[in-house]
Regions:
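Hydrophobic alpha-helical segments that drive targeting, anchoring, or assembly
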Residues: 4-160
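Long, compositionally biased intrinsically disordered terminal regions
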Residues: 2-12, 136-213
Length: 213
C-alpha cells in the first residue's frame, strides 16, 4: 500500500516515497494507456479498472484467502468478480499488476514491487521515447531507455560502470554525483527535462489495469 506524499502534485519524485518497498515507473511517448498495456502483453478484454489500494490488496493476498476479505470488492457483485477472474486477478494472486494512465503526450504505467514493463521498453518506444525506472525491494535501481524501437541504454544511476549501452550522459544528458538516491535523482531529472508531472491523487484512483503471472 502506498503512502501519500507531502506534496501530491509535484513532478515524479514523490513516487519513490509513496512506493517505498519497490516500484516501476514506465513512460511511453505518443501512446494511450490501453496501447501501453497491450504493448506489454495485455489482452484488451482482460483490462480492468483498479485503484491503487485495490491493486495492492490483490497482490498481497494469498490464494487461500476468501474474496470476501477484499475491502474494495462486493462479493455479491458477480459481474465484478467475473471481470477480475477473467482478467487474471483472481483466484491466484498475479505476479504483477500494471496500472496505466496518460499525461502530456505520454502514457505512464506504475507497478508496485514488480518490473514487468521493463522487458518491453523497446516495443513501447515505437512512436518516440520510452523509459523505465525500477527500484527493487532490496533498494537497487535501474533505468532503461529506448528510442523508436531500439534499446539505447540500461544503467544504474550513480554507477556508470554498470551501464549496458550508451552512457547515460550521452544518451539522455543525465549525470548523478550527489547524495540523493539515484532513482530519485533520475525522477527529478525527468521532471525537469521532459516537464512530466503525475498527480498522486490520479494514481490512487481507478486506472486501466492488467494482471500478469
Amino acid at each position: 500500500m502506498t503512502q501519500g506524499p507531502t506534496d501530491t502534485h509535484k513532478g515524479l519524485s514523490w513516487i519513490a516515497d509513496a512506493y517505498d518497498i519497490g516500484f516501476t515507473l514506465t513512460l511511453g511517448e505518443g501512446l494511450s494507456p490501453h496501447e501501453l498495456l497491450r504493448g506489454v502483453g495485455a489482452e484488451e478484454h482482460r483490462i480492468v479498472p483498479l485503484s491503487c489500494s485495490a491493486a495492492s490488496e490483490l497482490l498481497l493476498r494469498d490464494e487461500e484467502d476468501h474474496i470476501g476479505d477484499l475491502d474494495f470488492l462486493d462479493r455479491e457483485d458477480e459481474a465484478a468478480v467475473a471481470r477480475l477472474t477473467d482478467g487474471g486477478f483472481l483466484p491466484t494472486p498475479p505476479d504483477a499488476i500494471v496500472r496505466a494512465g496518460a499525461v502530456a503526450g505520454w502514457a505512464y504505467a506504475l507497478e508496485e514491487f514488480s518490473c514487468h514493463t521493463g522487458e518491453h521498453i523497446a516495443a513501447l518506444s515505437r512512436r518516440g521515447r520510452a523509459l523505465c525506472v525500477h527500484r527493487s525491494a532490496a533498494g537497487f535501481s535501474r533505468v532503461d531507455y529506448a528510442l523508436r524501437g531500439e534499446a539505447v541504454t540500461s544503467f544504474e544511476p550513480g554507477l556508470p560502470h554498470l551501464t549496458n549501452g550508451v552512457p547515460a550522459e550521452e544518451a539522455l544528458g543525465f549525470t548523478h554525483d550527489g547524495d540523493e538516491a539515484g532513482d530519485v535523482a533520475f525522477l527529478r531529472f525527468l521532471e525537469d527535462r521532459f516537464g512530466i508531472s503525475i498527480p498522486w491523487e490520479e494514481t490512487e484512483a481507478e486506472l486501466p489495469s492488467a494482471a500478469f503471472t
